[in-house]
Amino acid sequence: MKMREEDMEVSTESASLRVDRRSGELSLYGAAGMLLTRQNRPPRCGCGTPAGPGGTDTAAGASDDGFETQFALAAEERIYGLGDQLDTPLMKRGCKIAICFRNGKEVHAPVPLLLSSQGWGLLMDTDRRHEFDVGCSSPDVVRIRGGRGELAFYLFAGGGLAELLQKYTELTGPAAVLPVWAYGLSFNCNQQATARDMLEDALKFRREGIPCDMIGLEPTWMDRQFDYDGLVDWHPDRFYIPQWLPKGAHTFMGALRMAGFKLTLGLYLRDDGEAGKQRDLPENWYEYLKPFVAQGVLGFNLCTPIPIREMANAPVAADDRSEDAESLPHSTVVSRSIREGFATQTGLRPMIYTPVGYTGIQKYAAVWSGGRSRAHLSVLGLGLSGIPHMAVDMELHTAAGIHCGFFQPWAKVNSWAYWRHPLLLDPELLLLFKTYARLRYQLLPYIYSAAHVAARTGLPIARAMPLVFPDDPHAVVQQNQYMFGNAFLVAAFTDQVYLPAGDWYDYWTGEKFTGPADISYRVPKHAGGPLFVRAGAIVPMWPDMEYAGQKPADRLELHVYPGGAGEFTLYEDDGITFGYSHGEIAVTSIVCRDERRVFGVELGPRVGRYPDMPESRTWEVVVHALDKPAAVKVDGKQWRETKGSFKKPPPASWSYDRKTGTLRLLVPDIVERPDSIRLEISLSGGRVVRRMSEQQRSQSRPNVGHRTSDELEKDIEVGLETGNTAKALSALELWWSVRAAEAGSVEDVREHWLAMNSLFVRTAERKGRTLHEIAGGDPLLRSRFQSNYSAEDAYNSLAQIAARIIEYGKVQGDTYGIIRQATDIIMSEIDRELSLHAIADRLHLNSSYLSRKFKQEIGLSFSDYVLEKKMRRAKELLLAGSTVAAAADQTGFKDASYFNRVFRKYWGVTPGEMRS
């Protein structure tokens, strides 16, 4: 801790916090000393909150013990998090969000977690209703206020949204890893279902060959409503069980278990209905659930007595304090009690899922909601709020709904008050549902590994684009697509897809696309929506199963997609106990490398053990989108090609399917293997992967209209100078497609390649380096472009050189980045005195150097720029009705008379005249 006259500072390895000793205002700085955020007004506690329209506090009713604080927002700052908020975008800047369940909107899990693209996060520590005004009332301020309770919050810093989620996970606790079967398909029966109806629903899945694991019952299974105060029993008519023999294979639960199903029961969350009454749970209330768990129940669905939609719109009196006492953490407390009680009773992980949640719910339960028009936004919003297990009831009667429903962290069909069952669909939709269900079960090892990543790092299974591509300005605004794990890009309820930089494969057709690109996608008949696989992806798959665990995990398919380096970590455990949290887990690292003439895959040894782990296994390696290889080696030994059925191929052999462009080989593996297994695939031609058709290539180009080569070259230059990778590579791809179409020979291709390299040379020289110093490792630069190189080789070379130039600029910290940091500081601290020397010190620069570069880039001197921004801000405030004194204070003028003189000199009128 450092104590200074004006402030005190507390520092860690990743951040430092400064407190103004006069005002109490906080400023958070990153590890490099850059300002991340600051309070631009002293916090207020215990003195009430400002009155809203009509004289009542808009956050939570008038009170004398509320709180308020606010932080400055930078000009380009993006804000994410705040839980599941219907009808709000993923990026919350410009929104006003109440952290409560009853606010006129359908809210399932309000989480008071705010994540900033500037590298800082904030978590409120309160269980009272409060409100975030994220640049809605004032565009450059985030204001947090509540009507009751004390002001308490956590501030943390990180290198990006992913690192901030990890910090949140460390702060609140890791997400639970659900039982492996919970990541399959779940089906909730109609609320009027009987035991016979439930069994019939289950057997329909088996008869039709549709994989499914979980069958759920609504709370109507009981003889009376569960109130946490006494015993309940099965409904005597609809779920009759002989009291003299309540357990065993002869019961309806036993019949379900024999067919591979797991039963979950619905419970209503407690709702006392009295304003201000605490929802205290009786001690040891889990005892009332023990008999059902002993009979084989494996999970519980925590329901609300009335649907969330109706609850949201229930009228609330102006002076009703039940809103504030609604006990936001109630479902978290109930979920924790069940999870701990169930674990003590059985040693197994339960499947607990609830429609409402709050901070910390991720440690005990999954979250679900009813049908929504844009279900994926709820899933992505909670993923950005530290809750990785969110599912929205599948929209069963549309192809797009099935597509999105199966690519959620967990998949759920909810019949509830309706008749939703896949066997009631028309034949085409039924076939589509079956296709997706089987794919989901094949992907279970991939999904389950992503769940382990979520528990360890906070990175969700369904990942919003800003989380994965934070530096791509076009990617961060995409709301109708997301990454499912690290390999799959899913587009939901749209045929417009943006592919970030790199190569991508259409999962349904096998065609290759190159990004960055905007695509108008045509969904094949056998699919429900766009699905792409990233080049370099490694995807483990199970064989076909009707339910998780039906077959031992001793044979796994490993699908690999060339086009880049990739890695994947496979996490395996027993799938049902808590052993994974005590080290009973096996971890396998798999990497692939894509060199010019050799594609390699390395299978690391399994590290760790778990009960009943197979002692040996076979990897069925499937490499996609290849031309037929010249040779295949495993651990240095050449394998021979074989033809015919791949079900029982001879040892040490491989086969190639020309129609699908896939290479297959079976690689045996044992537990005690100390070293990695290395696969080397020597490619026969000049192309690493199959080329896409001309129709697909034209679809993958960004829609930029008719551009000349000169215009595209200017775009490339701008992208290289500003470090905008997406802009540079997009323009380069278009430029090359035009030039390649004109090329009639290898010499023509070489000329175009040299022409672009001359542009690269000029760019490198402006950075004070030669092109060989920046990108001398490029094979084509070394070899001077030989005659056997193809047009695709040439384009790949140019794209790699462009990427290296941009990366070099980022590493060196170019002028553009320095000036951007300086202007960000100015705009975020416009209400303070700003000097060139102070900002230069914070950026670790010489003030003369900063002054010179500022004038070169901005066109104004530092002092003129600051004055312009202060005067424009003052004008905005005055025209909005601010007093002269307030406008002076909020633009950093401590002397109002001096402010008057400066303002009049700048605008030609006094502040008072401007205001009137």
Q: Each PLM stretch: what is its role?
A:
Residues 823-828, 837, 856-894, 916:
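Terminal helix-turn-helix DNA-binding modules in bacterial transcription factors
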Residues 33-528:
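Catalytic-domain carbohydrate-binding cleft regions of carbohydrate-active enzymes
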Residues 535-637, 657-693:
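Accessory, solvent-exposed terminal regions and/or long lumenal/extracellular loops of proteins
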Residues 8-14, 489-491, 598-609:
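Short, well-ordered beta-strand segments enriched in hydrophobic/aromatic residues
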Residues 687, 692-834, 838-846, 860:
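Inter-domain helical "communication" segments and dimerization helices
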Residues 497-509, 621-646:
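Solvent-exposed beta-hairpin/edge-strand motifs
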Residues 839-843, 847-848, 854, 880-915:
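Sequence-specific DNA-binding recognition helix
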Residues 1-43, 498-501, 518:
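Beta-strand-rich N-terminal accessory domains
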